[in-house]
Amino acid sequence: MPSLLFTCFLVQLLIHLVNTFGADAINNLLWNLYNMFPTPTSQSAGEQKKLKREFMKVRHEMNATSSQDEFAKWAKLRRQHDKLFDQLEKSKSSLDSTKSTFDSSVSTLRWLGTNGLRMLLQFWFSKQAMFWLPKGWFPYYAEWLLSFPRAPLGSISIQAWTLACAAVILLVSDALVAVVALALGTQTGAKAKKMEEPMKAGGQGTEKPGKKEL
């Protein structure tokens, strides 16, 4: 049953990725990808990004302009700022309702493709053995637990296989995170040490010898 074994592992991996990155981050990524294609909201989303860039540019210029020394220029930038802000709010409100519907649809499809599919597989193949244990290697209670709830005694049930996949994926994920964190910490420490050495050398070179006391 290699195909079913791999399917269960893949579903559990997808569930772990969703839980790791978060549903909101995935929804935002899919929303941006959706608007890259010629969809009904792609034009509005593009205009909103353009308005946001113009708004940030005008806001930066307004903050860099003195309202006392250059009042005329500041007042003009202020009017542009308020106008772009109103346009940006209107564009955002019109897209928020569409994005809310999009997020609900994506969340439903994501649940059906991960947790829903896992529940369906566990129900449909609950009486089927994933693979068989070597006879006589495990005591009766261990065989009963591994075949729980309805798989043949002496076999691995789909529920036990799913739990094993989840445990392995979690262990590998934690190990990878620890290795990456250790590597980044080592690099940061080495860079900090290299920056400290020239500072110490410069400080020692500028020290003036004091008078020795007898």
Swiss-Prot record:
Membrane-crossing segments per the record: 5-24, 111-131, 156-172
Cited function: Required for the post-translational delivery of tail-anchored (TA) proteins to the endoplasmic reticulum. Acts as a membrane receptor for soluble get3, which recognizes and selectively binds the transmembrane domain of TA proteins in the cytosol.
HAMAP family, sorted: Get1
Keywords associated with the record: Coiled coil, Endoplasmic reticulum, Membrane, Transmembrane, Transmembrane helix, Transport
Residues in the Lumenal compartment per record: 1-4, 132-155
Disulfide pattern: none
Gene Ontology biological-process entries: tail-anchored membrane protein insertion into ER membrane
Provenance organism: Botryotinia fuckeliana (strain B05.10) (Noble rot fungus)
Region (Disordered): 193-214
UniProt subunit comment: Interacts with get3.
Gene Ontology CC: endoplasmic reticulum membrane; GET complex
Name recorded for this polypeptide: Protein get1
